UniProtKB/Swiss-Prot annotation:
<dbReference type="GO" id="GO:0160091">
    <property type="term" value="P:spliceosome-depend formation of circular RNA"/>
</dbReference>
<dbReference type="Pfam" id="PF16551">
    <property type="entry name" value="Quaking_NLS"/>
</dbReference>
<dbReference type="InterPro" id="IPR032377">
    <property type="entry name" value="STAR_dimer"/>
</dbReference>
<keyword id="KW-0694">RNA-binding</keyword>
<dbReference type="GO" id="GO:0030154">
    <property type="term" value="P:cell differentiation"/>
</dbReference>
<keyword id="KW-0813">Transport</keyword>
<dbReference type="InterPro" id="IPR004087">
    <property type="entry name" value="KH_dom"/>
</dbReference>
<keyword id="KW-0509">mRNA transport</keyword>
<dbReference type="GO" id="GO:0003729">
    <property type="term" value="F:mRNA binding"/>
</dbReference>
<keyword id="KW-0508">mRNA splicing</keyword>
<dbReference type="InterPro" id="IPR055256">
    <property type="entry name" value="KH_1_KHDC4/BBP-like"/>
</dbReference>
<keyword id="KW-0507">mRNA processing</keyword>
<keyword id="KW-0217">Developmental protein</keyword>
<feature type="domain" description="KH">
    <location>
        <begin position="88"/>
        <end position="154"/>
    </location>
</feature>
<protein>
    <recommendedName>
        <fullName>KH domain-containing RNA-binding protein qki.L</fullName>
    </recommendedName>
</protein>
<dbReference type="Pfam" id="PF22675">
    <property type="entry name" value="KH-I_KHDC4-BBP"/>
</dbReference>
<dbReference type="GO" id="GO:0045650">
    <property type="term" value="P:negative regulation of macrophage differentiation"/>
</dbReference>
Amino acid sequence: MVGETETKEKPKPTPDYLMQLMNDKKLMSSLPNFCGIFTHLERLLDEEISRVRKDMYNDTLNGSNNEKRTNELPDGIGPIVQLQEKLYVPVKEYPDFNFVGRILGPRGLTAKQLEAETGCKIMVRGKGSMRDKKKEEQNRGKPNWEHLNEDLHVLITVEDAQNRAEIKLKRAVEEVKKLLVPAAEGEDSLKKMQLMELAILNGTYRDANLKSPALAFSLAATAQAPRIITGPAPVLPPAALRTPTPAGPTLMPLIRQIQTATVMPNGTPHPTATLMSQAPEAGLIYTPYEYPYTLAPATSILEYPIETSGVLGAVATKVRRHDMRVHPYQRIVTADRAATGN
């Protein structure tokens, strides 16, 4: 009917959909010419990423079958107050468990998600809250670093009206307490989700539906690669196609052309026509140059005359003898060798 708008169902919060949203956000940030232009598009993209992460977080911790709680708050009554509460981390009971990484998440995304959902500020404080242990020891005892002398804890603060602040603080405490309960190895769904988010941020996430890991890696690399928008390519004329008949060798037509082209197009006789007419028996091999510069095989040593003058220092040329040997080790004695005694 006229006037009715079609409402499409929102996509389900899946890791693949979250990866697509993150890739779109990276693409928009990589285009300097479009940064700050599509403000509404960027806002909608951030809201969709927040919604998908929130739904995935709720499904991970609370289960997909549980009813979602309403985040509606009453109207504020009274002045703005600040409330805070400390939740100590059970590091003594579980010394090998990484509570700090579980609470903060990859690049602080889990803590940011809790802050956006509860409206409270969540910070990890106390001994062991800093990643750099040397820097922690240096800051211990300095002003504004007094919390390093306390045990590891989570500090939750909220600023709002009294009635609203109490509701927000209660929700935040419930959510943080869920993170302080360690799960068995292999059954920690929150850890799996955090690793998946880290893979999406690093560009190494692979879809479980793809059977070929090489194809999944190529898709992830293509998604992470920056795409450059270019103008339309100029239309070039089509290249000339090859003739269907094979072309002949290039040497023989050239020789035939030289042989047959006795008259040039302007009517003057070809310069090689006289040479060819003088020596028709030469055939295809002819030389327009003088004889000393022609290509000839190397002269055999047997063609040189034998020097018999007996000049001192002259090299005696050996004469090739064509006598056949009956036995390979038999020595042939000829008349000249018999005369000289050799």
